[in-house]
Amino acid sequence: MRIKSTLTLIAAATLLVACGKKEEPAPAPAAAPAPAAAPAPIAAPAPAPAANVVKIGHVGPTSGAIAHLGKDNENGARLAIDELNAKGVMLGGQKVTFELLAEDDAADPKQGTAVAQKLVDAKVAGVVGHLNSGTTIPASTIYSEAGIPQISPSSTNPKYTRQGFKTTFRMVADDTQLGGTLGKYAVNTLKGKSIAVIDDRTAYGQGVAEEFAKAVEAAGGKVVAKEFTTDKATDFTSILTTIKAKKPDVVFFGGMDAVAGPMLKQMKSLAIKSKFMGGDGICTTELVKLGGDAIADNQVYCAEAGGVDGEAKVGMDEFKVKYQAKFNTDVKLYAPYVYDAVNVMVAAMVKADSSDPAKYLPMLATTADFKGVSGPVSFDEKGDIKNGALTLKTVRGGQLETLAVLR
């Protein structure tokens, strides 16, 4: 049909037009705005250079029967270190910080050598310690082999500085002077004719007792008994009973306050009224506490291996005030000598402008007239203190009283 043909032609034409139309591409999305430039990062401040730390070791018995003395010594070292850091010390053109490495030797020789090696391994520049001769002497070999200076504030056995080591120094008089002075005092002043001697078998106790006995005999007295115990003993009935039978005018004990206190109590219970003498190990307020009412006035006589009098006493008194304010306790015995030992060691470093032991050791050995709170400090060729003082004391009214300072 004509109409049908016409419609077919129209449809075909429409299809051709549709097939021939070119498709327009979709418009491209608008470009995102460029991000603002990030601010340049602020450079972090350069880290401060690490502090130049100088390690100084301290060793004493901070556990055991005489821990009160070991802690006293450690406090003396800590006070010195804190003051040095507050003041500021320059070595080799740099400000240095001192660090205290404190170790406990429990007054035991084996533990003493172990902590000595520990300090050597930690590369300390020097060591102040030990307290007891029995730990100081074996430890000194380790320090000597490492070339590390050692200053003992309290060891009195002469052997310590007579081993030929260049690294050993002491701050107090030795047993030759300590025991010798007490021996002469027992005979000449206390008028002791018969004297009993007890020691605790330690290097310190045995050493001071031997020197005391020699001096007694040289002064014309007689040693009527020699007994020994240990530094950990608590029962002395057997040896005191033996001594009582000898009726001595004086009983001398070479040992420490922790043993002497109970010994005095047992002397009272056995009705032994002899004078009681000892070295610096018993010359403490702790002895007075431990002995209690067993100590009669003018019964106990002792000598502290050190001491100051006259104008020099001002410095010691000022130290005691500082110590009490910082640690809320009184000085027990050797804290001032530890304090001085640290300062003497650092003064040698300053003089050498180095904390290298090899460089400052010669300066330490030539220390002369250093003004310490314990008095002037000078060392002789062996490392012993020159003109070491002794302070004679007695107990009256439950207090230690100074009788005299001797040199």
Model-derived features with residue positions:
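Extracytosolic ligand-binding ectodomains
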Residues: 2-6, 10-12, 20-407
